[in-house]
Amino acid sequence: MALVNHRENVKGRAQILAIGTANPKNCFRQVDYPDYYFRVTKSDHLIDLKAKFKRMCEKSMIEKRYMHVNEEILEQNPSMNHGGEKMVSSLDVRLDMEIMEIPKLAAEAATKAMDEWGQPKSRITHLVFHSTLGTVMPGVDYELIKLLGLNPSVKRFMLYHLGCYGGGTVLRLAKDLAENNPGSRVLVLCCEMMPSGFHGPPSLQHAHLDILTGHAIFGDGAGAVIVGCVDPSGGTNGVVERGVRRYEQPLFEIHSAYQTVLPDSKDAVGGRLREAGLIYYLSKRLSNDVSGKIDECCLAEAFSAAIKDNFEDWNSLFWIVHPAGRPILDKLDAKLGLNKEKLRASRNVLRDYGNMWSSSVLFVLDEMRKGSIAQRKTTTGEGFEWGVLLGFGPGVTVETVVLRSVPTAKLK
């Protein structure tokens, strides 16, 4: 493919300089989760529904997930256990839990990213944070300033309620901030924790079974990256002097970023915050909407800006795709004609963590980087120079981020 040569402008491109992730301590094996879920919600009498849920979990391609809500929490807060037509008011309990725990998990991921970055925290100039839940004023961004010991004059951007595409949104915003504020370093965070989304199973007669689908795939997690524009003339050899790394080490370059709404897809996925918590809707058509429209509506537009001529070989890219679920990944594979290994990083994250909403693509980004190094690939993009990050969620809104890898030989 013929790519626009922009090496002379690389100083102005935003780069991902470090990545950190974190999960709650409670790990649930997928094979055990149906028995656990129906037991703690006192729903073992729903035999047919439990069998249906077991089949969902078996087909999910997930092996384990991490969640804050455990049996002890449910025993202390029985109002969270009800499902279907028996849901009761429990929003206060759920929000209080999220307001308390989301900042802690986000701070853990941020600390890992800053440790890898190796620079003084005083260099952080901007903070971008997203969480679908846990709304409070002042927000989690305010709490993170205190928890991380950041300068109180750090410029903060707080985003709520975006859902699964939020991981792409924060990167797009961070790119604009880094490239338009010389010398800036942007701490970017997504943290998703689902106390508001935990409900007991509905009855078979109840029409809304989407909650059951969510319980088969959703997990909690936080991802953090640091974004800035590094002058390549300064080198990237990671020399450490007096405990401070002299040079930063870019992992990926954020070449461009786009947001698109897929046509006629508003009802494919969404949610409403009710007195009983978050009630979400997951249409069976979601996988078809995403796989059927994403190439024409998103990929073609995004890569037309970076590629001079028509481009058809999607296998010449590395792929960082939101692991929304097995059906979406399978259909995207088939629609784009991708080789089997192309969505390896996304499938690995789905297997080990489930769908962590907006945080997921940051986990996939980390998996891509680590897997490339472990397999001795020549670049952080599995040996490929160019790649794409896709986040999608309610709308259906799609964030398309064009990335450029760096040679793994530069990483020490």
UniProtKB/Swiss-Prot annotation:
It holds the Pfam family Chal_sti_synt_N. It catalyses: 3 malonyl-CoA + acetyl-CoA + 3 H(+) = orcinol + 4 CO2 + 4 CoA; 3 malonyl-CoA + acetyl-CoA + 2 H(+) = orsellinate + 3 CO2 + 4 CoA; 3 malonyl-CoA + acetyl-CoA + 3 H(+) = tetraacetate lactone + 3 CO2 + 4 CoA; 2 malonyl-CoA + acetyl-CoA + 2 H(+) = triacetate lactone + 2 CO2 + 3 CoA. GO terms for biological process: orcinol biosynthetic process; polyketide biosynthetic process; terpenoid biosynthetic process. InterPro entries: Chalcone/stilbene_synt_C, Chalcone/stilbene_synt_N, Chalcone/stilbene_synthase_AS, Polyketide_synthase_type-III, Thiolase-like. Transmembrane segments: none annotated. Involved in the biosynthesis of acetate-derived aromatic tetraketides natural products, precursors of daurichromenic acid, an anti-human immunodeficiency viruses (HIV) meroterpenoid consisting of sesquiterpene and orsellinic acid (OSA) moieties. Accepts acetyl-CoA as starter substrate and produces orcinol as the major reaction product, along with four minor products including OSA, tetraacetate lactone, triacetate lactone and 2-acetylphloroglucinol. This is Orcinol synthase. It comes from Rhododendron dauricum (Azalea daurica). The lineage of its organism: Eukaryota, Viridiplantae, Streptophyta, Embryophyta, Tracheophyta. The gene is ORS.
